[in-house]
């Protein structure tokens, strides 16, 4: 075989390898990577670069003529990457006579597909994304600063409210004297006693209640310091009795027959007697004021009235105090009327019976 035959064979084989330039009578190509690129399974060894003046070799892309543009040929026929390497259309004719770049010299592409010509650096985000991230970061920082300012504004009023103290009541000497006097009589005054103190001292009732609470705490602290454990026990029992309306135990009442000193709870018994005395005084006044009438002040009372009055004088003062402590109800009044069935028609016997403890009326008779 001569050199011309080998050259013609090489040109026909190169035309067969170029995609899009298939010879007549060849089998249809598939869609595989090797078929699309025009690569055969067995390629001959590349020939030397100095064998001819034209484009030679089994896998050489045809050099474009002087009137054709290499970039357009590379875009239409050659795969990606080969057209960029073989763009010689703009070169002078002397350079076009040089041997073209052989396909065998180019490294084969991987079967998974052509590699990108210029991969971008993944670390560099696009400028639009970078600006968006910066704006997001700026907005988040602004929102954080605004939220912190709001929290500071919310915290400052709370601190101001915490620092603000309640107005303390300043008691005068007269007010303290009245309060101490009431405390010596009863450590647990009821609402009526507190209202009376409020009228006397010109203080609100809730301030008086708070003063009594503080005074009781001070008293308990002093008794603990002095070692009065029994007094503290009596004091706690007395407070429970007043708060829950519990009567005085029978054991304490029975032990009081020999006097306060012989009692098992002298302090509790003394406080109980003081409180009972305060209850009896307004009760007796109300009872006498309700039962007094115009008949008590008339001159020339009848003999029946004087006899009933003498009978009432014989009643002991203890029984009189017990009658005063009884609840003033209609049933109690009816019972007192039944005790004296032979009284006058206007009920003068009942009224004169209650006048026994009064010294002025007794002297008049």
From Swiss-Prot:
Motif stretch (Octapeptide motif):
31-38
Tissue expression summary:
In the adult eye, expressed in lens, iris, ciliary body, choroid, optical nerve head and, most strongly, in retina, but not expressed in sclera and cornea. According to PubMed:11978762, expressed in adult retina but not in lens and cornea. Within adult retina, found exclusively in the inner nuclear layer. Isoform 1, isoform 2, isoform 3 and isoform 4 expressed in adult retina, but not in brain, heart, kidney, liver, lung, pancreas, placenta and skeletal muscle. Not expressed in thymus and spleen. Expressed in embryonic craniofacial tissue. Expressed in fetal (week 14) retina.
Quick one: where is this thing mainly located?
A: nucleus
Gene3D superfamilies xrefs:
Homeodomain-like
The record's SUPFAM superfamilies line, in alphabetical order, gives: Homeodomain-like
Q: Residues annotated as region Disordered?
A: 1-37, 113-167, 290-365
CDD domains the record matches: homeodomain
Q: Where in the cell is it found?
A: Nucleus
The outcome of changing residue 247 to R is: In KTCN1; uncertain significance; also in a patient with retinal dysfunction
Q: Motif Nuclear localization signal: where?
A: 161-166
User: Where does this protein have coiled-coil stretches?
Assistant: none
For this chain's UniProt record, which GO biological process terms are given? neuron development; neuron maturation; regulation of DNA-templated transcription; retinal bipolar neuron differentiation; visual perception
Q: Name one GO molecular function term.
A: sequence-specific double-stranded DNA binding
* Family as reported in the entry's similarity comment: Belongs to the paired homeobox family.
The protein's role, per its UniProt record? Binds to the 37-bp core of the locus control region (LCR) of the red/green visual pigment gene cluster. May regulate the activity of the LCR and the cone opsin genes at earlier stages of development. Dispensable in early retinal development.
User: Which disorder is recorded?
Assistant: Keratoconus 1: Frequent corneal dystrophy with an incidence that varies from 50 to 230 per 100'000. The cornea assumes a conical shape as a result of a progressive non-inflammatory thinning of the corneal stroma. Keratoconus is most often an isolated sporadic condition with cases of autosomal dominant and autosomal recessive transmission.
Output this protein's name.
Answer: Visual system homeobox 1
């Amino acid at each position: 075989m001569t050199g011309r035959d080998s050259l013609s064979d090489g040109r026909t084989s190169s035309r067969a390898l170029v995609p899009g330039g298939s010879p007549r009578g060849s089998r249809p190509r598939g869609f595989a990577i090797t078929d699309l690129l025009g690569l055969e399974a067995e390629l001959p060894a590349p020939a030397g670069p100095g064998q001819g003046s034209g484009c030679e070799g089994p896998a050489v892309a045809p050099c474009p003529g002087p009137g054709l543009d290499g970039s357009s040929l590379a875009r239409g026929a050659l795969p990606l990457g080969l057209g960029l390497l073989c763009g010689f259309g703009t070169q002078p004719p002397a350079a076009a006579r040089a041997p073209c770049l052989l396909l065998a010299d180019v490294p084969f592409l991987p079967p998974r597909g052509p590699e990108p010509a210029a991969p971008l650096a993944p670390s560099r985000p696009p400028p639009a994304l970078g600006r968006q991230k910066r704006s997001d970061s700026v907005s988040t920082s602004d929102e954080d600063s605004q939220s912190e300012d709001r929290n500071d504004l919310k915290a400052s009023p709370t601190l101001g409210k915490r620092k603000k103290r309640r107005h303390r009541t300043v008691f005068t000497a007269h007010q303290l004297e009245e309060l101490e006097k009431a405390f010596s009589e009863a450590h647990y005054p009821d609402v009526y006693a507190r209202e009376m103190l409020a009228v006397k001292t010109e203080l609100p009732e809730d301030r008086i209640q708070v003063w009594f609470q503080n005074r009781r705490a001070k008293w308990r602290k002093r008794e603990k310091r002095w070692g009065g454990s029994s007094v503290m026990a009596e004091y706690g029992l007395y407070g429970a009795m007043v708060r829950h309306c519990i009567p005085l135990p029978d054991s304490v009442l029975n032990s009081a027959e020999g006097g306060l000193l012989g009692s098992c709870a002298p302090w509790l018994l003394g406080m109980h007697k003081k409180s009972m005395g305060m209850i009896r005084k307004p009760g007796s006044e109300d009872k006498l004021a309700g039962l007094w009438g115009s008949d008590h002040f008339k001159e020339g009372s009848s003999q029946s009235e004087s006899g009933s009055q003498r009978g009432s004088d014989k009643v002991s003062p203890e029984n009189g105090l017990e009658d005063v402590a009884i609840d003033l109800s209609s049933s109690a009044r009816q019972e007192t009327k039944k005790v004296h069935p032979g009284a006058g028609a206007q009920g003068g016997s009942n009224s004169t019976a209650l006048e026994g403890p009064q010294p002025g009326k007794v002297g008049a008779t």
